[in-house]
Amino acid sequence: MPSSEHSFISVPHDALRSVRSFLAFFSKSFNRDQVLLSAGSLAFQTLLSIVPLMAVILSVLSVSPVFDSFKQYVEEFIFQNFLPASGVEVQEYLWQFISKTSSVPTIGGLSLFIIALFLISTIDHTLNRIWGVDAPRKFFQGFTLYWTVLTLGPIFIGSSLVATSYVWYNFFTQGALADVQAKTLLLLPVMNTFLAFFLLYILVPNRKVKFVHAFSGAILATLLFEFSKRWFAFYVSHVATFEHIYGALSVIPLLFFWIYLIWVVALSGAEFVYCLGVVHPERAVVREFHPLLGISAVLLVIERISAAQSSGGFLTMNTLEDLCRSVTRMQLRRITDFLLQQNIIHKTEEGSFALSADLHTLTLYDLYAILPADLVQPKDPETSDSHFGQDLSGLEQNIIQCLQHAMHQPLAAFLNTATRTL
């Protein structure tokens, strides 16, 4: 009976602890990757590239006479799904700009295509940086991918509209199925938004992303996106600050602000998907006390970086993961963040890791004394009662003195000895 009661209580406790751990890691990852700053950078580049990008998409559709009649539907598809209800004025301005691109000469048209490629490349690099993929794609691989997106993407949308229209008007326009058509049309923008986020999260990262993680992230991003659309429409309708300040030019800051919100939502969803892949629920198991728990993983990371630097090279996060397979990706990020914060290592201009501290003067105890709580044995809150304060304080001093004596050796000497025994 006591055991069943204990299991009944521990399950919610473990679930709550896992949620707290996930939210804490998500918050750190969100701030470390500078999501808000990256969203602003992408919003600015998108604002400059949106007209060239739309011009390229419509020009690709104009190549085939089959899709030429669907250009209007593609326009409506994009604006109905990715602009709030108050975006009619924005739509009119954009189509005025896009219509003028048809008279651009060949060299100008090529520059529009290059600008659109740069936008897709920036999106690719920003998302992959969240997954810790610092090394860019090879030129030919990246160019082929971006070219495929720009050319086959519009054709895919056009083909989908052709097929959907055929099924719609042949099977869903009569009888009881007409009600199904009406209800489905209401959900279609949400479904399209979900599909766009899902494909973004599962295809763009140069890492294997689980289907369920991308699916969950797309659901979260879609909910945030729909909330943002309604909030933005309310803001524009009731708080007309931009119109009072900018007048007729208010469409530009409004469009920029809306694009910024889109990228905040998209990158937040990407961070959520990444965290789902690296954070695993912790099980409450009884472990033997190990006073040096956690320091071995930190020493392994330092040793790998030191060995590479001694050979004249530096390690990226990807290479470090391959060399430290016994360390989880989440723990490795925590360790590198800790070492960077303590100036034991630093990042080169290329984003690789290099040593900053002198391992001949930094001792094991120096390292152990500054290890954060999430890298060592967690304390049991039930044993922190002040009633045992004096006894525990004396015991702690004895342990510290023993550790100082036993660990008073430079890291370089310890790592050299450990390497020779391997």
Swiss-Prot record:
A cellular-component GO term for this protein: plasma membrane
Lineage: superkingdom: Bacteria
Membrane spanning residue stretches: 47-67, 103-123, 143-163, 185-205, 208-228, 247-267
Membrane topology: Multi-pass membrane protein
Keyword Transmembrane belongs to the record: yes
Subcellular location(s) per record: Cell inner membrane
Residues spanning the signal sequence: none
Pfam families assigned: Virul_fac_BrkB
Family annotation (InterPro entries): UPF0761_bac (IPR023679), Virul_fac_BrkB (IPR017039)
Sorted UniProt keywords: Cell inner membrane, Cell membrane, Membrane, Transmembrane, Transmembrane helix
UniProt entry tagged with the keyword Lyase: no
Family indicated by similarity: Belongs to the UPF0761 family.
Protein name, per record: UPF0761 membrane protein Paes_1471
